[in-house]
């Protein structure tokens, strides 16, 4: 889990556009966040397996 102080800090608008970065909206993780879903890879995987993300299915080839 992310530090609460960092999550709160990220909610404020950045002073400059280059300072802004993405965080997972579910857990607050700063790395490997998918912009389309605003979720980190771990949360994305959990919700996809539960079937809670419409249009997402497991790939097989």
From Swiss-Prot:
Top-rank lineage group of the source organism: Bacteria
Cofactor(s) the record lists: Zn(2+)
Keyword Metal-binding in annotation: yes
Pfam families to which the protein is assigned, alphabetical: Ribosomal_S14
Gene3D superfamilies in the cross-refs: 30s Ribosomal Protein S14, Chain N
Binding site for Zn(2+): 24, 27, 40, 43
Gene Ontology cellular component terms for the protein in this record: small ribosomal subunit
UniProt KW keywords: Metal-binding, Ribonucleoprotein, Ribosomal protein, RNA-binding, rRNA-binding, Zinc
GO biological process: translation
Cofactor binding note of this UniProt entry: Binds 1 zinc ion per subunit.
Molecular function (Gene Ontology), one example: rRNA binding
NCBIfam families xref list: PRK08061.1
Quaternary structure annotation from Swiss-Prot or TrEMBL: Part of the 30S ribosomal subunit. Contacts proteins S3 and S10.
Family, per entry: Belongs to the universal ribosomal protein uS14 family. Zinc-binding uS14 subfamily.
Function: Binds 16S rRNA, required for the assembly of 30S particles and may also be responsible for determining the conformation of the 16S rRNA at the A site.
Protein name: Small ribosomal subunit protein uS14
Organism: Lactococcus lactis subsp. cremoris (strain MG1363)
